[in-house]
Amino acid sequence: MMQKFRKLSLESQLFFSFMAVSVCLLLLSLSITLSSTITRQRQEIDKNISALAAYVASMDSVVSMLENGYPDGSANEALDSLSENFPDLNVIAIYNTTGLRFYHTNRKETGETFVGGEEEAILKGSQPYITIGYGTNGSQRRAFHSIPNSDGAIIGFVIASVFN
């Protein structure tokens, strides 16, 4: 191939060299732009699901639902409305400290328990965090937030997630 290239006129060699360098620079700039755009979008998603999880954890109806020990219709209505108004959010789930699910965006999954161990840190009092986990609907980006009662004791946790 190099022999064919060398047989070309100087003008053709310069043209092909310039085009090759231009294509390489174009691909490099596109990959950098794509990478930064994906990173920015991921940060925006993380910010949104974390803020939503914090909001849900602060809802009085959610706290009273966990304190009473059974799902509450008013809390379900408020959470359903919240879920409908955030179409990019795929799952909101609320659990008590033993992992029993009190609310899930998909009603069929209410009453099940959380498995996976990702919740252990939040139940021990860590700051809210985001993980990438694998659930019944595939890979998810999940924001964990603890739910404290009026005394500050952790009585459960909320997960807000989007599918990857």
Identify what each model region corresponds to.
Residues K4-S35:
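Extreme N-terminal signal-anchor transmembrane helix of membrane signaling/transducer proteins, especially
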Residues M19, T33-V63, Y70, S74, ...:
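Membrane-proximal extracytoplasmic alpha-helices
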Residues M59-T113:
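Extracytoplasmic/periplasmic helical hairpin
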Residues D72, N137-Q140, D151, I159-N164:
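Helix-start (N-cap) segments at beta->loop->alpha junctions
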Residues Y95, P148-N149:
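Core beta-strand residues in small-molecule sensory/regulatory alpha/beta domains
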Residues H104-G138:
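Extracytoplasmic/periplasmic sensor domains and loops in membrane signaling proteins
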Residues I154:
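Glycine-rich acetyl-CoA-binding "A-motif" of GNAT/NAT acetyltransferases
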